[in-house]
Curated annotation (Swiss-Prot):
GO process terms (BP): ATP synthesis coupled electron transport; electron transport coupled proton transport
Native source organism of the sequence: Ranunculus macranthus (Large buttercup)
Bilayer-spanning residue ranges: 9-29, 39-59, 89-109, 125-145, 147-167, 185-205, 224-244, 258-278, 280-300, 327-347, 396-416, 425-445, 544-564, 600-620, 667-687, 694-714, 718-738
UniProt name for this protein: NAD(P)H-quinone oxidoreductase subunit 5, chloroplastic
A Pfam family matched in the record: Proton_antipo_C
Gene name in the database record: ndhF
Length: 738
């Protein structure tokens, strides 16, 4: 089946007819194109399904042991320089192809219903298809120049989708923030590519892997410059994957439609940075210090993301910080050299996070009928609660995604996260301790999100009552403690405050908009029984529930592909290792070594205990009023007033303020970095206008007045000109003689 590999070059081009056809249709036949808009959604799903089948065949060939395949077209510019374009198929490529296509198909089916009321429906599907095409081109690229081209296209599509509702100021600002932040990473990536080309004379992966290794082994090149170039490449990945300190764009990217948030966080933009590090992994492993830098950035990011998610009120922002933290785990694994564990967690996290984001979209969709179209209200967990009664199917899927991300067996993320935690103990006890602590924080904030959304009562109907205030530790509740906001130049530092300023008046959905709403192109009847009301939240349509059902299946079973074999030989689901054999033979000579039952159970028991402890704390702090956790004598003992209680309140308040204000990092950038750049720009403008132009204009003005003076003195007579000429000559001679 060699032709399967030879035809792989067409993969990025298969989705392209959709945006082209939509663009031409809107230009030439706008009315007809809008009337048949469901057809475009159908073909978007169909073409991506073809790529998925193609990807599955390629993956099966890789698992069966087929070698890495590369096909290149060379464009010779002159005798000394040529550009090569082609496709590169290896296990990493096949993994990314399956992730992009499977998650992309579910998001497209979901989006048909979610975006059906939106006037930008066609524009959305055009962007989405081009986004998928760009990401597919990125993962099949055979050299760094090709990667950079598709890297920029992926970034462009993400900016368009983040700012999809560009008439909203927050969305426009978020789009600009993502653009500027990623410009830093993209420029660094470009410099790193040029530096590597200057060193190796090639853009091909295999060429500069071998050349760089030979140069280092033979001390044939400046190791500092090579380290600098690889560090610049890594900065590009840091920005794209929202790693510290270039993570600030990710929470604001939630201003885009929820389906695109699911795609960005699961399989496209943020995965692009991880893909770049994984693709260049052979280069990073032979460069001194760079692996330590990758691990350090990963450990900082996973802890920072977890702490910033602790007190967020917006359900999508909470999930965004969760993504940031989980990508930190993947980056940590790559920095430790755990290539297999990193890709394993990339796979499991993608499906779990797609499930959570699409579940949050179902929640937001149902809340909009109660609070109106307002992201500040429909995405605010303070106004939710008790949704189990109204959206039981969404609740079940969201709970399974939450448990998976918490690391509860046998769900997907348990297997991959547990492997990363085990490897971290071998790398650094300090890093391992932080990673385990963050695992507990992950369980806490994820279950906090679930409890605030689905348990208790619908808070919008009882705004002045919160069951959490009955808790002794109400100071970190969603409603907060009496306080104030300090507003400084459009940026505010929020302290613990009550939520009385929230207005419950909402815009009502336009009747004409509802009557003209298009039905989804896929109708799934008699699977789920949904009852809609317009005074309470309701369960989503079957077209939105079907992707949740499919992703639940992935969340249940995808983890089994990476279970390592045991000594007893009772489990043999080591599909992932067989899949990755061509890529990791040179990295882990002993990767086939298996764990015994005892070691596995001890490690699993430890990680699961941490997760359950975080869940217990979340139940204690955010459980509903009828929760039996509030009646424990032990808890009553801890919440008694006293000096220790006051100190504990202060600690909790500081943690809350740190988390809710995003660690003050955005404020630091706004007050120091952005203000400093603007101040420098103002000074440069002043210096240019007042000093530089002042000197130039001053010389002109002085020359003008001198000329005018001489003109009137001379009077136009030749005798006067001769007199002044002789006078100047005499002065010149006197000066010279002296």
């Amino acid at each position: 089946m060699e032709h399967i590999y030879q035809d792989a070059w067409i993969i990025p081009f298969i989705p392209l007819p959709i945006p082209i056809a939509i663009g031409l249709g809107l230009l030439l036949f706008p009315t007809t194109t809008k009337r048949i808009r469901r057809i475009w959604a159908f073909f978007s799903v169909l073409l991506l399904s073809i790529i998925m089948i193609f990807s599955v065949i390629l993956s099966i060939k890789q698992i069966d042991g087929n070698p890495i395949y590369q096909y290149v077209w060379s464009w010779t510019i002159n005798n000394d320089f040529s550009l090569d374009f082609g496709n590169f198929i290896d296990p990493l490529t096949s993994i990314m192809l399956i992730l992009i296509t499977t998650v992309g198909i579910m998001v497209l089916i979901y989006s048909d219903n979610y975006m059906s009321h939106d006037q930008g429906y066609l524009r959305f599907f055009a962007y989405m298809s081009f986004f998928n095409a760009s990401m597919l081109g990125l993962v099949t690229s055979s050299n760094l120049i090709q990667i950079y081209i598709f890297w920029e296209l992926v970034g462009m599509c993400s900016y368009l989708l983040i700012g999809f509702w560009f008439t909203r100021p927050l969305a426009a600002n978020a789009c600009q923030k993502a653009f500027v932040t990623n410009r830093v990473g993209d420029f660094s990536l470009f410099l790193g590519i040029l530096g590597l080309y200057w060193i190796t004379g090639s853009f091909e992966f295999r060429d500069f892997f071998e050349i760089a290794k030979n140069l280092i082994d033979n001390n044939g090149y400046n190791s500092f410059f090579l380290t600098l170039c690889t560090s610049l490449l890594f900065v590009g990945a840091v920005a794209k994957s929202a790693q510290f300190p270039l993570h600030v764009w990710l929470p604001d990217a939630m201003e885009g439609p929820t389906p695109i948030s699911a795609l960005i966080h699961a399989a496209t933009m943020v995965a692009a940075g991880i893909f770049l590090v994984a693709r260049l992994f052979p280069l990073f492993t032979v460069i001194p210090y760079i692996m330590n830098i990758i691990a350090l950035v990963g450990i900082i990011t996973l802890l920072l993301g977890a702490t910033l998610a602790l007190a967020q009120r917006d359900i999508k922002r909470s999930l965004a910080y969760s993504t940031m933290s989980q990508l930190g785990y993947i980056m940590l694994a790559l920095g430790m050299g755990s290539y297999r564990a990193a890709l394993f967690h990339l796979i499991t996290h993608a499906y779990s996070k797609a499930l959570l984001f699409l579940g949050s979209g179902s929640i937001i969709h149902s809340m909009e009928n109660v609070v109106g179209y307002s992201p500040d209200k429909s995405q605010n967990m303070a106004l939710m609660g008790g949704l189990t009664k109204y959206a039981p199917i969404t609740k079940t899927s969201f709970l399974l995604g939450t448990l998976s991300l918490c690391g509860i067996p046998p769900l997907a993320c348990f297997w991959s996260k547990d492997e990363i935690l085990n490897d971290s103990w071998l790398y650094s006890p300090i890093f391992a301790t932080i990673a385990c602590l963050t695992a507990g924080l992950t369980a806490f904030y994820m279950f906090r999100m679930y409890l605030l959304t689905f348990e208790g009562h619908l808070n919008i109907n009882c705004k002045n009552y919160s069951a959490k205030k009955n808790n002794g530790l109400y100071s970190i509740s969603i409603w907060g403690k009496m306080g104030s906001k300090v507003i400084q130049n459009n940026y505010f530092v929020s302290t613990m405050n009550n939520y009385e300023k929230i207005t419950l008046k909402a815009k009502q959905i336009d009747d004409n908009g509802i009557s003209n709403m298009m039905r989804p192109f896929i109708t799934i009847n008699k699977i789920f029984d949904n009852t809609k009301t317009f005074t309470y939240p309701y369960e989503s349509d079957n077209t939105m529930l079907f992707p949740l059902f499919v992703l639940v299946i992935f969340t249940f079973f995808i983890g089994y592909i990476g279970i390592l074999p045991f000594d007893q030989g009772r489990i043999h689901f080591d599909i992932l290792s067989k899949w990755l054999i061509p890529s990791i033979n040179f990295l882990h000579s002993d990767f086939n070594n298996s764990f015994d039952w005892y070691e596995f159970l001890i490690n699993a028991l430890f990680s699961v205990s941490i997760a359950y402890f975080g869940i217990f704390i979340a139940l204690f702090l955010y459980g509903p009023a009828y929760s039996y956790f509030h009646n424990f004598n032990l808890i009553n003992f801890f919440i008694k007033r006293g000096p220790h209680r006051i100190l504990w309140d202060k600690i909790i308040n500081r943690v809350y303020n740190w988390s809710y204000n995003r660690g003050y990092i955005d404020i630091f950038y706004a007050k120091i970095l952005i203000a400093g750049i603007r101040g420098l720009a103002d000074f440069t403008y002043f210096f240019d206008k007042k000093v530089i132009e002042g000197i130039v204009n001053g010389i002109g003005v002085i020359s003008f007045f001198v000329a005018e003076s001489i003109k009137y003195v001379g009077g136009g007579r030749i005798s006067s000109y001769l007199f002044f000429y002789l006078f100047y000559v005499a002065v010149f001679l006197v000066i010279c003689l002296n």
